[in-house]
Amino acid sequence: MSDLILQASNLEKEYRDGKLKTPVIKGLDFELRANEKVAIVGSSGSGKSTLLHLLAGLDKPTGGTVSLMSQAFSGLNEVKRGRLRNQYMGFVYQFHFLLPELNALENVMLPLRVRRTPSKDAEKQASALLDRVGLGHRIHHKPSELSGGERQRVAIARALITKPACVLADEPTGNLDESSAQQVFDLMLELNQEQNTALLVVTHDLKLAAKMDRQYQLTEGHFILPSETL
């Protein structure tokens, strides 16, 4: 069985305003394999978030293909794309997007409840994962009662609760101070190893990116050759 999780081939994306065309991604190829940790870095406006949305099947490319677990998004309707994402992907964003009316435990349980996991089983799994990320004593607190770092830990737990094949993270530490950012990022790397989950992170922080197995610099719609980190 192939260990290839996510693949993009000759990927292109352009935006149009009347006759004006603005290319953002230009003929890009990319692969993410099982258990890999990969960072995409680039300046603001370089197209990093656009690329992540394309790789997640959340946006349609102008050209080329994206495949998740050997299934091309282009060959699936919206419902089937959603099912494929929900089965194999987890997401962490710069803004945590936790539901404010739910506590930490309930937020982490949500993906399991969507899958119709029995409530008691979902609660047990969510509680154990929150304990693993250091929030076992905060499971009944709502997002407004948590610090920025704690909220992001809850978001990480929510992304991992279904044991996805890969996690896509868009500036996951962008709203945190340096100390909290280091702690949260290191936690993501630890969980990547523990759960055998591939990790793709978009970040502007070169120090954090240096901790990954591979780095890609996105410049003018292309990747500069990846550098292998030691």
From Swiss-Prot:
ATP binds at residues 42-49. GO terms for biological process: lipoprotein localization to outer membrane; protein localization to outer membrane. This is Lipoprotein-releasing system ATP-binding protein LolD. It is an enzyme of class 7 (translocase). Part of the ABC transporter complex LolCDE involved in the translocation of mature outer membrane-directed lipoproteins, from the inner membrane to the periplasmic chaperone, LolA. Responsible for the formation of the LolA-lipoprotein complex in an ATP-dependent manner. It is a peripheral membrane protein. One of its GO terms (molecular function) is ATP binding. The complex is composed of two ATP-binding proteins (LolD) and two transmembrane proteins (LolC and LolE). Signal peptide: none annotated. Its EC number is 7.6.2.-.
